[in-house]
Amino acid sequence: MTIAIGKAEEERGVFDIIDDWLRRDRFVFIGWSGLLLFPCAYLALGGWLTGTTFVTSWYTHGLASSYLEGCNFLTAAVSTPSNAVGHSLLFLWGLEAQGNFTRWCQLGGLWPFVALHGSFALIGFMLRQFEIAQSVRLRPYNAIAFSGPISVFVSVFLIYPLGQSGWFFAPSFGVAAIFRFILFFQGFHNWTLNPFHMMGVAGVLGAALLCAIHGATVENTLFEDGDGANTFRAFNPTQQEETYSMVTANRFWSQIFGVAFSNKRWLHFFMLFVPVTGLWMSALGVVGLALNLRAYDFVSQEIRAAEDPEFETFYTKNILLNEGIRAWMVAQDQPHEKIVFPEEVLPRGNAL
């Protein structure tokens, strides 16, 4: 007679069963974050492809914006709703469209659809990095780094128009449409002179410089561990030792600049810190623009330039250029406002 001693198997709940299935090791990991990521990414991308292929912007902007109307990849866009809609979420079943899909597209309903699902998809992707990092016992710095692009997307596409009078003032989802929005930001907010924009540019370009320097330095200090004829065949992918010399790299940059990173942790943290902080700062600046905050208005130079025709600076020339952008864009974008600029604020003929 055999007697088995042990604990009885506990009853597994529905949550445990779902958790096991979601976090199972498979070719494409799903996880709990995937419940947010995959549906939202699918709907956002599908909405954008549908809009750029078929949907006109005639009713919202008076523009052609789809492949069907003759646009190409650079000029097609999913455009924002008209200014009359305000901040309505434009649900398909809402008061505006009343379940009519064609009318919903004409009103610009695809834009909030793509913007909101796109935002949640990006957040889902960040949570995916958190979830997988936890599973394989990694620190969560990848997810923290990805918060930079998310903060920029949310601030530009959601927070900025929420601070203005409607979704109309957000960027449309298209290449040329984004360029037009950049000109709008410059003309109405003098964005290039904003210190938060400067920090964002420093972060992005500084990160590109660091990336190029780091990649070149590692390539320059690789050990010759194998007999391969080129760099990429000279190493065993399973080797345990380092593939490049930090000491040699440190000596090189110490001679070049007089200072160099002393260890890899500080080096790679700095490469993380520069771009992410730059993106965070630029997102913060856009939140300020949503509230119509100004930065670096050198009024004394403007007054002197107005009084003395021979006095001009690059700043005063840019201010006049911004006024020209506003004078053109208001008539183009907001004809319903019937805004008339007084003569004294229009660009002078010889000023540009």
UniProtKB/Swiss-Prot annotation:
InterPro entries (UniProt xref): D1/D2 (IPR055266), Photo_II_D1/D2_sf (IPR036854), Photo_RC_L/M (IPR000484), Photo_RC_L/M_CS (IPR055265), PSII_PsbD/D2 (IPR005868)
Name the residues that bind a plastoquinone: 214, 261
| Molecular function GO labels | chlorophyll binding; electron transporter, transferring electrons within the cyclic electron transport pathway of photosynthesis activity; iron ion binding; oxidoreductase activity
Q: How is the cofactor bound?
A: The D1/D2 heterodimer binds P680, chlorophylls that are the primary electron donor of PSII, and subsequent electron acceptors. It shares a non-heme iron and each subunit binds pheophytin, quinone, additional chlorophylls, carotenoids and lipids. There is also a Cl(-1) ion associated with D1 and D2, which is required for oxygen evolution. The PSII complex binds additional chlorophylls, carotenoids and specific lipids.
Chief subcellular location: plastid
The residues that the entry says bind chlorophyll a ChlzD2 are 117
Localization recorded for this chain is: Plastid, Chloroplast thylakoid membrane
Detail which positions bind Fe cation.
214, 268
Record-annotated membrane-spanning stretches: 40-60, 124-140, 152-165, 207-227, 278-294
Key words of the record: Chlorophyll, Chloroplast, Chromophore, Electron transport, Iron, Magnesium, Membrane, Metal-binding, Oxidoreductase, Photosynthesis, Photosystem II, Plastid, Thylakoid, Transmembrane, Transmembrane helix, Transport
Q: Which residues bind chlorophyll a PD2?
A: 197
* Membrane topology, from the record: Multi-pass membrane protein
A single GO BP term for this record reads: photosynthetic electron transport in photosystem II
Q: How does it assemble?
A: PSII is composed of 1 copy each of membrane proteins PsbA, PsbB, PsbC, PsbD, PsbE, PsbF, PsbH, PsbI, PsbJ, PsbK, PsbL, PsbM, PsbT, PsbY, PsbZ, Psb30/Ycf12, at least 3 peripheral proteins of the oxygen-evolving complex and a large number of cofactors. It forms dimeric complexes.
Q: What else is known?
A: 2 of the reaction center chlorophylls (ChlD1 and ChlD2) are entirely coordinated by water.
What the record says about family reads: Belongs to the reaction center PufL/M/PsbA/D family.
Protein name as it appears in the record: Photosystem II D2 protein
**GN (gene name):** psbD
